[in-house]
Amino acid sequence: MAKRRVDQMLVDRGLVESRTRAQALIMAGLVHTPDRRIDKAGEQIAEDTPLTLKGQDHPWVSRGGIKLVHGLEHFGLSPAGLTCLDVGASTGGFTDVLLHEGAAKVYAVDVGHGQLAWKLRSNTEQVVVLEKCNARALDTAIIPDPIQALVCDASFIGLRTVLPAGLELCVPGAWAIALIKPQFEAGRDAVGAKGVVRDPAVHDAVCQMIHEWWSGLPGWTVLGIDPSPITGPEGNREFLIAARRDG
């Protein structure tokens, strides 16, 4: 496995905005691998090593916001003035970014409860909190507004299962960005220890499968797939897929 400088890896994964910031965090003792603290910015480690920050280095209520910011920039999409649906809202990292980027309204859907950050939960003018809500059962009785943008960062369930109902609520011209998580899409035999999928061939196969599925939905066009700037839990690689509804 090739090795790379830790400070550059932090930048490339979107955990920090610059090598200078990365070096400052390393000197402060805030950068860790799963088994130790990184002490030198110039240290070279295996390029697939999971890295975490013990202090927050982004403005969002969760690090998930980093992923959506990258997706919006990469695919050239904007939620400004739109009514949006956040599937698998959890703490609200994606909802936070949508509002920051000018979304008019966000329906924050999650099967759990009590997770959404207070600053979002208390924004009753723009955020509709739908807790204990099964995204597979969404309809116009639950969400009466036409959805113009959909985002999804769901866990323990595949996109082909969790997205169809929400996508049906999207109007022509709407766009969507979702995270492909191979550990929840691949077969059990492809998932290794601690639920980690390390084989690039499995990553490619899963991304191709989701691309073909979404492309086959009436009226939808896939805009592309791009690696997430940061890894998921335990170092799992994740991928952002974007699509637009044409009709």
Regions found by a protein language model. Give the residues of each.
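A basic, amphipathic helix-loop patch mediating RNA/tRNA/ribosome contacts
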Residues: 1-47
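Conserved class I S-adenosyl-L-methionine
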Residues: 79-90
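S-adenosyl-L-methionine
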Residues: 107-157, 161
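Core SAM-dependent methyltransferase catalytic element
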Residues: 230-247
